[in-house]
């Protein structure tokens, strides 16, 4: 089963400490080695983003940042695991690394199953 994992936080948290970067690199390397990590990456800030909004008036292109955004996705991963419990455990480990290595960090790890993926394999 494939899942999309989002690391969400407020943009004013600053840069992650080197200890977190090292711990995450090690965890990501292990996940690639065991085949559970498909793709991962960090995202540029909202100031470098653009949305295309659809409403009754048509399409509107809006450059970030967006005043209504409270938490934003700062990173993502696509994982391939046996079941939802394994996906949640993977996300819990990421949250714990943030807690251990960046005590001031506040955010959320969102886990969503990817629709339409062949779960057989």
What are these regions (language model features)?
Residues 1-121:
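Conserved, structured core segments of small domains
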């Amino acid at each position: 089963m494939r899942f999309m994992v989002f690391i969400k936080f407020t943009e004013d948290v600053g840069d992650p400490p080197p200890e977190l970067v090292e711990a995450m690199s090690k965890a990501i390397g292990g996940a690639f080695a065991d085949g559970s990590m498909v793709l991962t990456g960090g995202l540029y800030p909202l100031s470098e983003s653009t949305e295309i909004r659809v409403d009754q008036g048509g399409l509107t292109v809006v450059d970030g940042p967006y005043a209504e955004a409270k938490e934003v996705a700062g990173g993502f991963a696509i994982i391939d695991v046996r079941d939802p419990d394994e996906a949640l455990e993977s996300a819990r480990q990421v949250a714990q690394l943030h807690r251990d290595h960046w005590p001031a960090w506040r955010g959320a790890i969102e886990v969503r199953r990817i629709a339409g993926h062949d779960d057989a394999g």
